[in-house]
Design a protein with these regions (language model features):
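Sec-dependent N-terminal signal peptides
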Residues: 4-13
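Residues within alpha-helical transmembrane segments of multi-pass membrane proteins, especially transporters
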Residues: 13-15, 374
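Extracellular/periplasmic ectodomains of large secreted or surface enzymes and adhesion receptors
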Residues: 377-399
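C-terminal outer-membrane/trafficking sorting elements
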Residues: 391-401, 405-478
Length: 478
C-alpha cells in the first residue's frame, strides 16, 4: 500500500508541469504527460523507447506499457488525464537504447538489443493495478532481440542473440501455448539461407504471412506454415523508389494496403504500397511530415488511419482511406526543441520512437526518447468517424500510370470532364511545373505527357474540366 501511494504521489508530481511546455499540434489533444525516467539514460540522453498497451477486460482498465533505458513501466490510463504508475520492472542492464514490449493475454514480453549483460523478461500483469509479477528474467531462450511481434499464440523475435555463443538468428518463432514457458518452433535460417535473409529488423505478422523488414535487403514476405512449422519465401520487394534501410511496417485490416518506413539514410519518406496481390506489389503513394523528416514506426488502425512516429517531428496521423492520395489529418509534436516542423533540420535520430493506438478508448500512447510519455486523443473525426454510407468516395474519373513514373505518364480519362480539360502538375510546395490542355470526344480518352524535365520527387496531377476537378499524387523516379 505504501508503494502504491508513493507511485500515485510520483505520478501527480510528474504531471504538475503539464502546462509548462507548449507542443504544436493539429487535431490531436494532449491529455497527460509523464517523465518518470530520470536515471541511467542511454546515448544522446535517450530515456524512452518502445511502448505498448493492454486492456484488462476483467477490471475494465486500460494500461500503457512503456520501455525505458533501465526498466519497464506499467501505467493505469483508464482515466487518461490522470494516469497512475502502478509498477515497474527493472532491467538487468541500465542505460539501454533499444527496448521493445508486446503482450499476449495478460503476459508482457520485454526484449532489449543493447550489449551484454542483457535478458529476456516475461511479466504477468493479471494483478494490476496493484502490481506485476516477473515470471522469467534471464537468457534461457536468448539474451538479446531487436524487436518482437505477437500474432495469435506465437512470438516472433527479430535478430535474437544467444548468450554463450553470441550467435544471432535472423528470426525465430516461439509458441506461447504456455505463456510463461515459450517453446521454440523454428529458426528462419532452418528454411531460408542467410544469403537471402541474414537479418530481420522488425516484422508485421497476420496469420501465416510475415512481412519482414530486413534492412538493406528490403521487405521480404514469408509464409510460416503453422501445421509443419516451416518458413517459405513468398516475395521479395526491394529496389523501390527512395529505398533505404527497410525498418518496419503495418498492414490495413482488409490486407490491401501496407505502410513501411526506411530509416536510413535520414529523410526518406514512408511508402504506401498495394499488397492486395503479393505477386504485384506497387507503391501507390509516399508520405512524410516534411521533406527532411524521418519516419520511424507506422501503426495502422482499421483501413483508414495510419499513425507514424516521426522522430523529431513527433507523431503524425494520416488519412489513408484513399491509399493513392493520403493526407495529413493531424500531428502532435512531442519534440518541440528540434525537428523540421520547428525550423530546425537535423539528421539526428531523436524524438518520437513509437506509439500504441489500439486501446478501446482510442487514446494514443506515444513515447519521445528524450521528452517522456504522452497520452493523446484524436479529434472527433478520428474517434467517431462518419458512417460508411456517409463516407463513400465518388468513383475516380481518370487514372494515371505508371506510378512511380520515369520518362512519361499515361492518362486514361473518362468523359465526365467534357470536351476541354486542363492538366496541371504541381510540386509539393504548390508550384506549377507543367501544364497541358486536351480536347476529348470519346467516352474514354488516352494521352501521354513527357516528364523528363521534372526532377525526382512527389507531384500532384490535377485534371480540370467544365464540371469536374480531380487530383492524384504521382512519384517521379528517373
Amino acid at each position: 500500500m505504501k508503494n502504491l501511494l508513493a507511485l500515485i504521489i510520483c505520478s501527480i508530481s510528474l504531471l504538475s508541469n503539464l502546462k509548462a511546455q507548449t507542443y504544436p499540434s493539429l487535431n490531436i489533444n494532449l491529455l497527460a504527460h509523464l517523465n518518470p525516467e530520470t536515471d541511467n539514460t542511454g546515448n544522446d540522453n535517450r530515456k524512452y523507447s518502445g511502448c505498448w498497451g493492454w486492456y484488462q477486460a476483467a477490471k475494465n482498465k486500460e494500461y500503457a506499457i512503456v520501455a525505458t533505458s533501465s526498466k519497464t513501466y506499467f501505467i493505469d490510463v483508464t482515466n487518461p488525464a490522470a494516469p497512475i504508475i502502478c509498477d515497474s520492472v527493472k532491467a538487468l542492464k541500465n542505460g539501454c537504447t533499444w527496448r521493445e514490449v508486446k503482450n499476449y493475454q495478460n503476459y508482457c514480453y520485454i526484449v532489449s538489443d543493447d550489449n551484454p549483460p542483457n535478458s529476456f523478461q516475461i511479466v504477468d500483469m493479471q494483478y494490476l493495478p496493484d502490481s506485476v509479477h516477473v515470471v522469467h528474467s534471464g537468457t534461457t531462450y536468448f539474451e538479446r532481440s531487436h524487436t518482437i511481434f505477437v500474432d495469435h499464440n506465437r512470438l516472433y523475435c527479430g535478430a535474437p542473440k544467444d548468450v554463450v555463443t553470441g550467435y544471432e538468428s535472423p528470426m525465430r518463432v516461439y509458441s506461447l501455448a504456455n505463456p510463461e514457458n515459450p517453446v521454440l518452433l523454428r529458426r528462419l535460417e532452418d528454411d531460408i539461407s542467410n544469403t537471402q535473409i541474414d537479418y530481420v529488423h522488425d516484422m508485421f505478422v497476420r496469420n501465416d504471412t510475415i512481412f519482414a523488414s530486413t534492412g538493406w535487403k528490403g521487405l521480404q514476405i514469408l509464409k510460416f506454415d503453422t501445421l509443419t512449422n516451416h518458413f517459405s519465401l513468398i516475395q521479395t520487394y526491394d529496389g523501390y523508389p527512395y529505398d533505404g534501410y527497410n525498418h518496419s511496417s503495418w498492414q490495413t485490416d482488409n490486407r490491401k494496403t501496407m505502410v513501411f518506413a526506411d530509416e536510413v539514410p535520414a529523410s526518406l519518406p514512408a511508402k504506401v504500397i498495394d499488397v492486395s496481390d503479393l505477386n504485384n506489389i506497387m507503391i501507390v503513394d509516399t508520405i512524410n511530415s516534411h521533406a527532411l523528416a524521418t519516419p520511424h514506426n507506422p501503426y495502422i488502425v482499421g483501413n483508414n488511419w495510419c499513425w507514424i512516429s516521426t522522430y523529431q517531428d513527433g507523431i503524425y496521423l494520416y488519412d489513408i482511406s484513399n491509399p493513392s492520395n493520403t493526407t495529413v489529418h493531424g500531428y502532435f509534436d512531442t519534440h518541440p526543441q528540434h525537428g523540421v516542423n520547428d525550423n530546425f533540420s537535423t539528421s539526428a535520430y531523436r524524438g518520437n520512437w513509437g506509439a500504441y493506438p489500439y486501446l478501446p478508448s482510442k487514446i494514443i500512447i506515444a513515447c519521445d526518447m528524450q521528452n517522456g510519455i504522452f497520452i493523446l486523443e484524436g479529434d472527433v473525426n478520428y474517434t467517431n468517424p462518419v458512417s460508411v454510407k456517409e463516407n463513400v468516395k465518388q468513383p475516380s474519373t481518370f487514372s494515371v500510370y505508371p506510378n512511380p513514373a520515369s520518362n512519361e505518364i499515361n492518362f486514361l480519362i473518362a468523359n465526365q470532364f467534357h470536351k476541354t480539360i486542363t492538366c496541371v502538375i504541381t510540386d509539393m510546395l504548390g508550384k506549377v511545373v507543367l501544364e497541358n490542355s486536351f480536347i476529348i470526344n470519346d467516352d474514354f480518352y488516352k494521352t501521354v505527357i513527357n516528364i523528363n524535365s521534372l526532377k525526382n520527387g512527389c507531384y500532384f496531377v490535377t485534371l480540370k474540366g467544365t464540371n469536374s476537378n480531380e487530383t492524384k499524387k504521382i512519384i517521379i523516379q528517373h
